[in-house]
Amino acid sequence: MSRNNHQNHSLYTPQGQRKYISQDERQRFLAAARQLVRQELMTFCTILAYTGCRISEALELTSASVQPTNAVVAIRCLKKRGGRTIIREVPLPQYVITSLTDVHKLHSADCPPRLWHYSRSGAWRLVKRVMKSAGIRPGPHATPKGLRHGFGIHAICSGVPLTLIQKWLGHSKLSTTTIYLQAVGTEERLFASRMWKPPTNDVISTGT
């Protein structure tokens, strides 16, 4: 694997900075999004956090992409695979579906084809602005890509099978998805906690 590929398949930069938002930062980001006056920006931030989709994939979503009955959103993978069009369905909580339906008037004849009309760079800046208002410090994690990585880690921590996370994120190779195991390490923390366990009183020498 080349150096660039290794860096792309890591949750840290060569300088040791993490590329993903933490669970606390994710919750603060969503809370800041809920306070936005611009409701369409709120739903945009929400869809990024709850699907882990790429920002360009979110901008391609239409009213037909949202399936309220099944509570899923159908996302077209923008990374081509042999010229085939790949659509992946990602489940959403019912309250997110309701929010999308209400804000974008999905049941109305006046519903625009595209859910959002931002440019990619404009959407990137808007998301960064919401992160700043959420008190998330600048860095490689405070980006739309950081939200994508944060989704993967949140899914791993929630016990979602790796193959399902691969499907939801649109990874062609499972090896790409396994990077999220780097940030969990539940078993490692368990072993470490045993090392950190303080000695009992009958072992500690008082020196008297």
Summary of predicted features, one role per range:
Residues 47-48, 154-155, 168, 180:
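Short alpha-helical segment immediately N-terminal to, or the first helix within
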